[in-house]
Amino acid sequence: MRPAFDADVIIAGAGLSGLSLAVALLDAGLPEDARVVLVDPRETLSGADRTWCFFDLVPHAFESAITHRWSRWRVRNGAAEVLRSAPGISYCTIPGERFYELALERLAAAGQRIELVLGVTVEHLEDRGAHVDVHTSAGVLRARLAMDSRPPSLTRAADDGNDVNLLQHFRGRVVRSTEPVFEADTATLMDFDVSQADGIHFIYVLPFDAHTALVESTFFTERPLPDAVYEAAIDTWLTRRLPGVVFQTISHESGVIPMTTEPFDAWPSPRIVRIGTAGGHVKPSSGYAFLAVQRFVREFAPRVVSALRVDGCAEPPAARSRRTIALDTIFLSYLRSRPERAPDTFYRLFERVPPAVLARFLSDTGTLADDLTVMRTSDSPRLALEAIRATPLLRRKTR
């Protein structure tokens, strides 16, 4: 590497996408004389306040970080309940601390090729043609390529009147009881038998054993709510579903995920690539991101390694296909125009669509046949009407 550069690649942010890309670069054969620097504003990297969940549909580098698998998944709507499973498919979770532990172990074994710079904030990136200037709170760093995983501000969904902009926001707690009250093999993905007064709302439950579970209150609305709203919803759900049971709170977690039809500018300049949420790797209609990030870095990392060998640029693969963008646009447009229909619509999806097909659809790994099955067996007439209403959006998103 030429002395004029502080790094071959600088990654702004050491979260899910930043660490996943760094690991993927090693797997792709990052040269021994190359240098990758991850810059993160946190003093200590820890994922104790988050988990990533997904259907285990594609292989990835963090299989050993999976701590729980559920062979069945449930959706409730009022008194109605649908319970589903699919051969060879589980719903999985990776706790944030396990992900960080595994990723950091891999990076530490890479020696001088990987460096973590903590307690430093990346302020902005400037493509200078032959290199990138990374402006930070500690000064300017120079790199051949820069990857920007800094998430957008999500205190409120922007609304320009054209695109659909919602937020998936949640707060949850891990609770434990002395009594065995949870079904350890069944994840409750959506329980809509809760108040809908503040917008589309459901409870999400991941039992880790018969005594312990993560219980989250989740909303699809334009802005997050006070913590007390989520906490009250969890208390109400626990009291109604498990009356008389005393719970101890072990930990809390919260988050905000964009659900938007706005396009993401993932390649703002030849030497700067946006990744993760900033790169559009979150599926707008479901909020799932883990598998999308893993698919992206697995395809992108070899391009970066090849670019470094010739001092070139690396074009990122498309985060999502035109087909899936179109389907999410229709679905989000429908949720915006008919939020009161959301519980029935989601319930029908899980009730009518074959579980393996729906798992692939929700994870953006489905085929055209899968997508047609979902459209044909879901709330078809209303979604067809929404497709007509969303036509101007579709033209802008898919051209």
PLM feature spans:
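Beta1/beta-strand and adjacent pyrophosphate-binding region of the FAD-binding site
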Residues: 2-17, 37
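Short hydrophobic core segments
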Residues: 10-12, 39, 140-153, 272-273, ...
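N-terminal FAD cofactor-binding segment of flavoenzymes
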Residues: 20, 24-80
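Predominantly flavin-linked oxidoreductase catalytic cores and closely associated redox partners
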Residues: 24, 28, 106, 110-247, ...
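FAD-binding beta-loop-beta segment adjacent to the flavin cofactor pocket
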Residues: 197-200, 255-275, 284, 334-340, ...
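Long, low-complexity C-terminal extensions of enzymes
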Residues: 294, 298-399
